[in-house]
Amino acid sequence: MIIANKQIKIYYNDNDNSNTLPVIILNNFEEQINEIITECRHINSKEFILVEITNINWNKEMSPWKITSLFKNEEPYLGNADEYLKVLETEIIPEIEKKIEKNNKKVKYYAIAGYSLSGLFGLYSVYKTDKFKKIITASGSMWYPNLENYIKENKISSKVESIYFSLGDKEKISKNPILKSVEEKTKLIQEYLSNKVKTIYEENEGNHFNETAKRIAKGIKWSLEN
């Protein structure tokens, strides 16, 4: 279905009789819902409802503030995360909730998940809203300039219970000085936030684009258990 010009897909396990389930909101660059669900089943995750949102203006809507492009011919990072978050909270989630209720389900809580820049968006969002109890940031863009300072200078939502961080072990190998800081900054942010909420940092094999659905699924499984 289409809500606010975004493509929305909702997954339910029709064989599960639970009435109240966690709902995971996944902002994604491309449609992967079937791959992610397959991976979740393979690793025996707990039951949940997955909402995948695509057709996102990636560098515009997932970025918290403006920065210059990292590469030639790359779209600029325009810093419209606040505007998109408002649309997510006031337009998209209410419609999703209606759809869930029509299927005789209830929302236990909301979690927010993302990969790469949308992993950054998920973490940033809990400094702006109390909507989400859990965050899954798989290979998240923790390299983003000034992010570490923002996290230290602002207050995370008191509703947050856990945050999952992961990276590929080769992601720090980059000629770009900003991108090559991703592992160092991810670990620093995870360590800082571990004093406030339950966190984990998990390292996977490969670069940024390796087994993305599997990495998201691993984050979902951990989040549902923590």
Provide a role label for each language-model segment.
Residues K9, N19-K102:
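Serine-hydrolase catalytic machinery in alpha/beta-hydrolase-like enzymes
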Residues A113-S118, G122:
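Gly/Ala-rich beta-loop-alpha elbow adjacent to hydrolase catalytic centers
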Residues Y109-G114, A138:
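Short beta-strand immediately N-terminal to the catalytic nucleophile in serine-hydrolase-like folds
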Residues I25-N28, S139, L167:
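The conserved beta1-alpha1 loop
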Residues M1-P22, T199:
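A domain-start/cap signature at the N-terminus of enzymes
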Residues Y124-K134:
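Conserved hydrolase catalytic core segment
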Residues M142-S223:
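The feature captures the conserved acid-bearing segment of alpha/beta-hydrolase catalytic domains
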Residues I37-R41, S125-V126, Q190:
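A conserved amphipathic alpha-helix that caps or lines the catalytic cleft of carbohydrate-
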